[in-house]
Amino acid sequence: MKKIVLLAMGMVLSGTALAQDELETTVKADAVSSYIWRGQDLGNVALQPTLAVGYRGLSLTAWGSVGLANTTDTKEFDLTLSYTIGGLNIGITDYWFNQFAGGDPEGRYFKYDAHATNHVFEANIGYDFGFAALQCYTNFAGNDYKKDGTRAYSSYMEIVVPFKLSAVDWTATVGAVPSSSVQYATNGFAVTNVALKATKDIRITDTFSIPLFAQIAANPCSQKAYLVLGFTLQP
């Protein structure tokens, strides 16, 4: 009996150790000179923290953004549940903003009433081919309506091509909105995001470095362009 108990305890402890080894936790924060998202200007200097846990391709990520230079910038808190297998990934994101036109003027997080919420729910699917990654996103619930009050199902598609040049990691991105959308300020199909980003690790010590990145982003639809500088802090 004693041997059986010891064997059972050993199996439990080994299983727990294995689960701990397979569970991945991410804690990091980006500081950016301006918050540019899919070709849209969403604020000035911002701190953008991330907390994520992952297990065998399944991950839950909390992401936020808060203005540093301008305290009236919109605060954002997003939750994403995603699954990746091979090059395929699918996910659902709950976006929340403390300010939202047509939403809750009091900025309450736990208010989900139709036509009075500051949440937007988005589904995505994508595939990473290695030489390029394709992603498609569509809003399916929350504060996303046409001017006549019907659901808009605002969508966005983008292709990202990574490459390396002069010991620097680069990505080239082209994104488009396929139809009219109040959220993306489009009246039909429109290219809304053309971006080029460079990232290089700045070594601080032998065991610690800070990724520094710069990005040129343009929105052909709104005829605006942006230059963003930022860095990432991650233990």
Residue ranges with predicted function:
Residues 28-35, 58-68, 90-98, 107, ...:
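Transmembrane beta-strand segments that form the barrel wall of outer-membrane beta-barrel proteins
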Residues 196, 202, 223-235:
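Outer-membrane beta-barrel "beta-signal"
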Residues 20-53:
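Outer-membrane beta-barrel initiation region
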Residues 1-24:
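Cleavable N-terminal export/targeting peptides
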Residues 169-204, 213:
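Outer membrane beta-barrel transmembrane domains
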Residues 19-24, 91, 162-171, 199-212:
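Short loop/turn motifs that connect adjacent beta-strands in outer-membrane beta-barrel proteins
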